[in-house]
């Protein structure tokens, strides 16, 4: 269902979750920039662009984590996702190469100099991707600056990473990966599930690779990342027998975007997961041309970055316009020409 907060003949921005029975109450606040889906004969009379005040817009750079060990093992055999050996999966050597390439890209394109905040999901693979991509070039002896990552953190052979001249990093639970039920594997490959393991189906419902480590451990490995928004040291959100439904992921994602819109920063990087991105971004683009909808919501590959404009269409943003100029209200005889023009 498409939200009708704008006039019916405008379709610049998205405010619905297509697979839900009714619109999310909070979704109408936000939009991702896209084109109109107007018929060709209407293009000359109806605008195909969106026009919003600049101070109500943010640029967000969405990044999926680089290749993790769970990605490799899962490609070989889907059953591997159920292995405790993949608990809080770390990056592979190829994953770190992907991070190095993305690091070069954000520096060469100027993105790294514009970003004011890096938001990251508190799992090892996303933390490693975030600091490797948006962190400093490396720690140097004698430079008194906090470390984004200690040397060798997370079974890596990487040197320490400095936060020198880098933006703040903050970990947020609400952009974590979704929980996946074993039913997926039951449908994907029925024969692997023997009757003796059927009882496990009732209690073992999600991937251990999506369960995070304690925050105490993360603070030791990533000293300069702010974990203050995470309320519990242990992972109380991951459940061994509960599957988060797609619509719930979308709702969580929309709430996360709402939170982004309240931040003072105007350009933000978010390092997160493919499932979270797919379900959240699928909430947008339903009144766009199909090619634009696909550009918004298609699945991310490892270490992919896409940039969007996030628009707050309500009055939730309190930031004043920084580039507007009020002009001068004329009085007396000088006002006559303006008054005449308004009649």
Swiss-Prot record:
Keywords: Chloroplast, Plastid, Transit peptide. The record marks 273 as: Transition state stabilizer. The keyword Transit peptide applies. GO terms for cellular component: chloroplast. Residues 322-343 are annotated as: Disordered. SMART domains: PGAM. Residues 1-35 form a transit peptide. The keyword Plastid applies. Gene3D superfamilies: Phosphoglycerate mutase-like (3.40.50.1240). It comes from the Eukaryota. The active site is at residues 65, 177. Pfam families: His_Phos_1. Its main location: plastid. It is found in: Plastid, Chloroplast. SUPFAM superfamilies: Phosphoglycerate mutase-like (SSF53254). Belongs to the phosphoglycerate mutase family. PANTHER family: BROAD-SPECIFICITY PHOSPHATASE YOR283W-RELATED (PTHR48100), HISTIDINE PHOSPHATASE FAMILY PROTEIN-RELATED (PTHR48100:SF1). May play a role in carbohydrates metabolism. This is Phosphoglycerate mutase-like protein 2. The lineage of its organism: Eukaryota, Viridiplantae, Streptophyta, Embryophyta, Tracheophyta.
